[in-house]
Amino acid sequence: MRKFLSKEYHRTNPLWHVYRLVKFSKVFKNVIIIEFSKFIPSMVLKRHIYKQILNINIGNQSSIAYKVMLDIFYPELITIGSNSVIGYNVTILTHEALVDEFRYGPVTIGSNTLIGANATILPGITIGDNVKVAAGTVVSKDIPDNGFAYGNPMYIKMIRR
């Protein structure tokens, strides 16, 4: 079950009010850092920037590949466990804007987890330990430990250990 907070805007597009929820200066800083960091080849330097400047909780030996797009409004709501791999061009969102509602929530990715290339993780999602997410999957609900998620819409199979 996705866990997120919600702010309703009746008959108004919430993106017109977004800077009432998040300071423009914070978003501007996050955009610069995230866009710059996408192209850093050093995992050590990239992890340091994400942990120290964006306050993302990243476990030991986890790697974030080239061109990964992190949420620009609330990157501090992202947690990645130890020894996990976030593949090429993955998008991790902690917010979503609907026609009349703005939602945001934490994203937690467990340890020893692989997120395949071009996957999208929606806000409020928890992905367990030892999970494999196939390339191109839209993660729209929680995935338990030892799961294998694939497709759009997403299907989950359990991996026997």
From Swiss-Prot:
Highest taxon above the source species: Bacteria
Regions crossing the membrane: none
EC numbers for this chain: 2.3.1.-
Keywords: Acyltransferase, Repeat, Transferase
Single GO MF annotation: acyltransferase activity
Pfam families tied to this protein: Hexapep_2
Family: Belongs to the transferase hexapeptide repeat family.
Protein name per UniProt: Putative acetyltransferase SAR0816
